[in-house]
Structures are given as structure tokens and as C-alpha cells.
């Protein structure tokens, strides 16, 4: 609140770090929520910049209407210097009241017992896990208003001897974490809790709710387990699996330590904080002018990984030129575009919004992909041509970026496209020679034309752990011998679909390649894969949502061969 009041007086940029969801800060205290909570919520919207302590916190605020390009992300880092030896484990655990022996597998949590931490789910999940793995013990460090209820719940479930309520731990937390085998968290809401990185420092296998920034640390089945809030059955299964498998605990704990110590150290946090302050100062000093930045228009926000990869590549190029450049994207799903790319985004049909953006920008990019064509829709051709004309008339330089041209079948459309492009476009970059020939055949002679490559080729694959997690979530072993089918519904596909199934059978029986049906456009392509796989008598998998371009590239890099009806599946495979 004070920062919001001083903002205009000082003329300085004001930034705040958001550690928690302001709507939950005063849970259970209605008067404080009504007063302090309301003041905080209003003040937060009046600041220049905000730093979220996880990407999930930033996403939450963007989804509530905060400007997407005014956020930074920083993660809580800790010192990963190896801790000293903490002494006898059993002696320490027994001093806290835990009923343990040499064979016990100890699950631990350090948290306040309040509704947000949802420890009832922890106790229920532990009881379910203990039924399958009697070695399990639960150690709870902390206190709070729900302690009596949790104690009664443990007794009701018959695990009162196996659950130890240790209260607040004195003498630091290193000894507590060093005595655990499994670190657990059951919160309904978090940003990025220190409890998990503290556990990672001690190489602990970890089970947590998939809330806040936690999925950015834990890759499912790769370096830990995630479950949905309140799902005590899933928690119980995870605890039992870890309790019964010493090697699994060791492996997951080591993988989590590797990631946390590299990406979530205190050194990384300090470096990121300094970079954020430098960026804010640059943006504050940036000369304000009537026109600044770029408007980007394409087939974005439709769930097509190829089109979204083009946008990602364009944004990467723009930010390499000017990291502080204002960017507005015309999208069919502006909310998703804002959340994914942290840019301003307006709906394609919101004429007033994108027209206003054009009058404030310096550059308009029509890109990329095959936008100038009338096979899938003539209305889309009219839309893109109208936007090109509007952008130029608004005073922008106009570039068609990474394009494929055609087919434009109607003569009237060819004439209209040539007229608009000749009059209003400054530069065109094309991704293949056929498009150059098509432009010449249409009579386009005025813009500068350059033959380059598809923008998506500059994108890199995601880290292996992220790719492994995407595959494992789909039930696909990360390292097999695979043949990818990236299919789509097209005219006559229903009749031809069995041929893809026959090819999959042949490849499996002849070369030992297991078919994986990958959806490039996740809203449309899964049905094509299901149709082709109908009647298969061999093992096969479906990857209906491989995430962003990086993880799709990573997934396709695990394939021995790719059969594709989608151009960008081939481009991703080549990358």
C-alpha cells in the first residue's frame, strides 16, 4: 500500500514480490480479509511491476487480469552446501516420540497445522500407504489449530502409534530432514515452498500436491511424485511404492537433488534478482514515445503446436533484438497466449483492441505458416489481408515472416492477395522455394523477398527430465524403440486410416518399432490417431498432449522414425 502511494510522488518504478495468493492470505479471518485483504488487492494493481515467487503465482495473477508483460519470476533458493553429519538417526527420532526401528521408512512434513496445509489428507494418505507398507512412519513437525482434529483422525484410522506429532522442532531443521526417508507436502495452495528444496538438499524422495510452482521442481515419475489436492488415495499409493522400494527412493532423491541444486540455489536466486532490477531500470529509462513495439498476427491460440512454435520462435527473435520491446499478439485464445508467453494479447475478433494496438506499434508481423491460402477457409484469407492493410495504414512497417504461400485457388483471391501484398507489405521471408514461385505467379513484385527457413527450426528441445515426465504421464517408457505417427483428419482420411494401422503393425513385427500416435494439434488430432489405431493387435501409445514446442521436440527426438501429415512434426523431428 505504501509503495502504491509513493509511486506518483517519487516518479520511481515500484515493484513488489508476491509470495502468496492474496485471496487466501487471511483464510479463516473474515474481518482481516475484508480490510487488509481488500487494501492489499487494490494496492497490488496500482504498482508498476510484480515479482512472483513461482511461475504458477505469476500465471494466477495474469489469469485475474494483471498485465502479462509486467511480471517477473524468481524462485526461493537455498544454500546447497553439504550439511554436516547430524548424529544418530534413531536416537533423534525416538527423542521426538516416534515409534521407529532400523527398518522404518519415515515420512516427514514440517508445516503449520492450518486448513491450507490440509494435513488431514496427509494422515489419510499415510494410513492408506501404511496398510500396504507397514514399515512406514509419519513424523509431523509443527503445531496449529488443527492438531486435535488430526490426532483424533490418526486414532480413528488406527495409525496413532505410527504418527508422531513432534511439535515445533528446536535446534534447526537440518537434523529433522536428515532423519527422514520421504518428504511430503499436502498443501491446497503454495507458491514455491522452501520445505521441498530443504528436503532436496538431503536427497529425499518427495511426494507433493501439484500446486503453485511445485511442478516446476518436480517432474512426475522422474524426480518425485505429484498428486492433486485432497487425493489421499493417490498419496497412499505413492507412499507405499516408495516405502517398499529402497532403490526407487534413492533414485528419485538423487534426481531431485541434481535439479534443485542446479536451478534453485541461493546463487541462482541472487543472480535472477539482480537481472530483474536491471530490466526494471532499463524499462523505466526507456524513452516513452507515441509508437513502440510490435504487433504479431497468425493462427495462434488454437492448440496447434506448429503454429504456437512459430510464435515462440518469433518472440525469441524479437526479444534477442530488444528484450524490453512491447509485444501484442492477436490470438484466438488471448488468455492462454498471455499465460504461456507473458505478452499482451487481444482476441482476433476484437477489432477495437487490435486496431488500437496497431496505432501504437512500429512493426506488424504477419507470421508464420501458410496464412495466405484459401483451401481451409476463404474468410481467414480475407482476415489476414485486411489486417495487413490496416497495419500499414496505421503507420507500421509490415513484414510477412516465415511464410508458406498458397494454395490460393480462386482467381479473385489471387488478384486480391497480390494487390494487398504489393501495396502494403515491406518485407517477406519465405520458408521454401515453392512459395517464392507462387508469389511470382500471383504477380507479387514490390516487397523485398528473402528465402529463409521455418522459424520453428531455431527452437531447442526441452531438458531430458521434462521430456521423460511428459512421456511417463502418457504411460510411455522414455527410452524405447518407437515409430511416430502424427496424423490429422483430412478429406478421405477415414478411408485411408486403416493403412496407417497396417503400417504400424508391419513396422512393429518387422523392425520392432512400437507405434506412438502424437497429436500436434491437441484439440483435433487425437481422434485421427484413435481411428488409425483401431483394431491394432500390437502394443501402442497415444501422446495427445506433449506440452510446448520444447517437449514435443524432445519427445520426437526419442522416435526412430516419424510418419507425419503435419509439417511441424517433421520440422520438430529434424530439429
Regions from the language model: what does each represent?
Residues 188:
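Aromatic "clamp/platform" in nucleotide-sugar-dependent glycosyltransferases that forms part
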Residues 13-15, 23-46, 59, 405-420:
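Nucleotide-sugar donor phosphate/pyrophosphate-binding loop at the beta->alpha transition
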Residues 168-169, 175-180, 553-557:
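Short alpha-helical donor nucleotide-sugar binding micro-motif in glycosyltransferases
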Residues 45-72, 78-82, 428-446:
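A short, active-site helix/loop in glycosyltransferases that binds the activated sugar's phosphate group
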Residues 146-149, 160-169, 176, 225-226, ...:
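Active-site donor-binding acidic/aromatic loop of nucleotide-activated sugar
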Residues 105, 109-128, 138, 145-151, ...:
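A conserved mid-protein helix/loop that constitutes part of the nucleotide-sugar donor-binding site
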Residues 283-575:
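Active-site anion-handling motifs in enzyme catalytic cores
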Amino acid at each position: 500500500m505504501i509503495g502504491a502511494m509513493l509511486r506518483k510522488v517519487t516518479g520511481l518504478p515500484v515493484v513488489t514480490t508476491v509470495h502468496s495468493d492474496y485471496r487466501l492470505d487471511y483464510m479463516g479471518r473474515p474481518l482481516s480479509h475484508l480490510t487488509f485483504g481488500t487494501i492489499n488487492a487494490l494496492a497490488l494493481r496500482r504498482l508498476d511491476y510484480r515479482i512472483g515467487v513461482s511461475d504458477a503465482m505469476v500465471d494466477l495473477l495474469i489469469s485475474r487480469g494483471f498485465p502479462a508483460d509486467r511480471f517477473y519470476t524468481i524462485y526461493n533458493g537455498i544454500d546447497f552446501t553439504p550439511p554436516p553429519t547430524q548424529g544418530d538417526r534413531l536416537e533423534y527420532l525416538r527423542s521426538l516420540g516416534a515409534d521407529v526401528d532400523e527398518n522404518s521408512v519415515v515420512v516427514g512434513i514440517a508445516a503449520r497445522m492450518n486448513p491450507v496445509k490440509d494435513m488431514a489428507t496427509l494422515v489419510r494418505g499415510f494410513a492408506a500407504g501404511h496398510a500396504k507398507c507397514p514399515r512406514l512412519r509419519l513424523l509431523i513437525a509443527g503445531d496449529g489449530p488443527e492438531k486435535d482434529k488430526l490426532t483424533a483422525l490418526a486414532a480413528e484410522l488406527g495409525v496413532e502409534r505410527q504418527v508422531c506429532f513432534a511439535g515445533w522442532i528446536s535446534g534447526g531443521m537440518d537434523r529433522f530432514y536428515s532423519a527422514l526417508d520421504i518428504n511430503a507436502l499436502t498443501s491446497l495452495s503454495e507458491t514455491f515452498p522452501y520445505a521441498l528444496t530443504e528436503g532436496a538438499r538431503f536427497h529425499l524422495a518427495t511426494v507433493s500436491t501439484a500446486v503453485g510452482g511445485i511442478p516446476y521442481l518436480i517432474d512426475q515419475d522422474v524426480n518425485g511424485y505429484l498428486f492433486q489436492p485432497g487425493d489421499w488415495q493417490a498419496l497412499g499409493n505413492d507412499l507405499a511404492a516408495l516405502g517398499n522400494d529402497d532403490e526407487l527412493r534413492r533414485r528419485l532423491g538423487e534426481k531431485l537433488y541434481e535439479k534443485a541444486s542446479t536451478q534453485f540455489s541461493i546463487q541462482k536466486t541472487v543472480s535472477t534478482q539482480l537481472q530483474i532490477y536491471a530490466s526494471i531500470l532499463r524499462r523505466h529509462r526507456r524513452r516513452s514515445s507515441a509508437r513502440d513495439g510490435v504487433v504479431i498476427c497468425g493462427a495462434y491460440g488454437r492448440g496447434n503446436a506448429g503454429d504456437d512454435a512459430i510464435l515462440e520462435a518469433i518472440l525469441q527473435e524479437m526479444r534477442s533484438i530488444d528484450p524490453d520491446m512491447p509485444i501484442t499478439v492477436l490470438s484466438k485464445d488471448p488468455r492462454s497466449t498471455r499465460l504461456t508467453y507473458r505478452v499482451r494479447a487481444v482476441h482476433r475478433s476484437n477489432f477495437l483492441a487490435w486496431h488500437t494496438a496497431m496505432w501504437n506499434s512500429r512493426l506488424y508481423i504477419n507470421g508464420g505458416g501458410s496464412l495466405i491460402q484459401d483451401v481451409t477457409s476463404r474468410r481467414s484469407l480475407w482476415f489476414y489481408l485486411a489486417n495487413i492493410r490496416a497495419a500499414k495504414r496505421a503507420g507500421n512497417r509490415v513484414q510477412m515472416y516465415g511464410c508458406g504461400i498458397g494454395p490460393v485457388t480462386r482467381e479473385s483471391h489471387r488478384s486480391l492477395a497480390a494487390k494487398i501484398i504489393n501495396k502494403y507489405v515491406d518485407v517477406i521471408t519465405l520458408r521454401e522455394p515453392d512459395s517464392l514461385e507462387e508469389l511470382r505467379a500471383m504477380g507479387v513484385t514490390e516487397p523485398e523477398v528473402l528465402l529463409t527457413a521455418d522459424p520453428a527450426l531455431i527452437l531447442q528441445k526441452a531438458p531430458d527430465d521434462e521430456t521423460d515426465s511428459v512421456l511417463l504421464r502418457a504411460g510411455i517408457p522414455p527410452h524405447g524403440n518407437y515409430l511416430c505417427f502424427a496424423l490429422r483428419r483430412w478429406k478421405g482420411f477415414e478411408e485411408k486410416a486403416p493403412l496407417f494401422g497396417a503400417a504400424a503393425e508391419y513396422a512393429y513385427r518387422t523392425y520392432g518399432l512400437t507405434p506412438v500416435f502424437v497429436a500436434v494439434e491437441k484439440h483435433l488430432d487425437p481422434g485421427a490417431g484413435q481411428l488409425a489405431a483401431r483394431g491394432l493387435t500390437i502394443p501402442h501409445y497415444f501422446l495427445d498432449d506433449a506440452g510446448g514446442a520444447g517437449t514435443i521436440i524432445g519427445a520426437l527426438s526419442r522416435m526412430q522414425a516419424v510418419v507425419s501429415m503435419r509439417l511441424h512434426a517433421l520440422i520438430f523431428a529434424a530439429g
